[in-house]
Swiss-Prot record:
UniProt binding sites for substrate: 135-139, 168, 181, 280
HAMAP family named in the record: TsaD
A Gene Ontology cellular-component term: cytoplasm
Cofactor: Fe(2+)
Binding site for Fe cation: 111, 115, 306
Protein name (database record): tRNA N6-adenosine threonylcarbamoyltransferase
Family assignment from sequence similarity: Belongs to the KAE1 / TsaD family.
First-level EC class: transferase
GO molecular function: iron ion binding; N(6)-L-threonylcarbamoyladenine synthase activity
Originating species: Protochlamydia amoebophila (strain UWE25)
This protein's encoding gene: tsaD
EC number(s) per entry: 2.3.1.234
Function (record text): Required for the formation of a threonylcarbamoyl group on adenosine at position 37 (t(6)A37) in tRNAs that read codons beginning with adenine. Is involved in the transfer of the threonylcarbamoyl moiety of threonylcarbamoyl-AMP (TC-AMP) to the N6 group of A37, together with TsaE and TsaB. TsaD likely plays a direct catalytic role in this reaction.
Amino acid sequence: MLVLGIESTCDETACAIVRDGKDILSNIVASQIDLHKEYGGVVPELACRRHIDLIIPVIDQALNQAKLTLEQIDLIAVANGPGLIGALLIGLNTAKALALALRKPFIGINHVEAHLYAAIMSHPQDFQFPCLGVVLSGGHTALVLIKQIGQYELIGQTVDDAVGEAFDKVAKMLNLPYPGGPEIENLARHGRSVKFNFKAGQVKGRPLDFSFSGLKTAVLYAIKDPKALKEMVLLSSEMTQDIAASFQEAACSDIVKKSLLAAKQYGVNTLLFGGGVTNNCYLRKLFSVANSNLNYIWPSAGLSLDNAAMIAGLGYYRYQLQNKSDSMDLEPLTRTPLQSVKE
């Protein structure tokens, strides 16, 4: 089955064509980083307008790269949430229009679930379920017990900022360019992670939940004069590196600790990672050092950030499970939990 996937949840306009869930024939991603960089983050209105400009050219590129026509596509898959409402509408309405015009089935895909599926696409060997899904991105931080593809139990999540959002906000405090994650990681390589005793937050009675807002505030107090928060302290390059290293250590070690605790509590040996923060080399090193006996499944570089291949790939399996097209009344959802496919 040939599946055309569309992704427009935030600031990437993407289209991909995947055969039978894993064979990627094309994977086109148009990034908006240059558009949003001067604002230090994504501006929803600008993102939406750029999606309108790019969606059709990106679909054409995906078809050309795969050497296929629209008539050869068997299924349309589209991310319908969670994400920015305006951005989601562009992708969803485009998918509906294609499905109607071509008289093909279409299916809505949960963006967070697709991030987890990206790791499966990156490693075509068979998996032993259940396993632990660890979602780490700019908009999401969650621990998910994966019983099978399409069968999930949310066991931990952030109660405030996502870890990727925290990286971006700390980078902005340090006057680093957007996106901040890679900038923090690069600076941290030269810093001393023990210089500042930063700690990620703990949620009372919920040991698998995350909280990064307090960590972010602690960094703010380290940067600014506590008695006059509007006045910036002039940071040396050495101090900037130390702050970056200490922040990264606190955030990553908290993720490792809670992920391994979840794996132990639920008796799983395989951890499946999804989201852009999984590109962080220090995070990967911490996991390997903390427990080298577990099986860590990381997404490949081309599938860790937002892309449409993961949407198309998961769309194939979701369609096999539910065995019917979604309704044309399917709506975009800014917030939507992982949902298991009903038997």
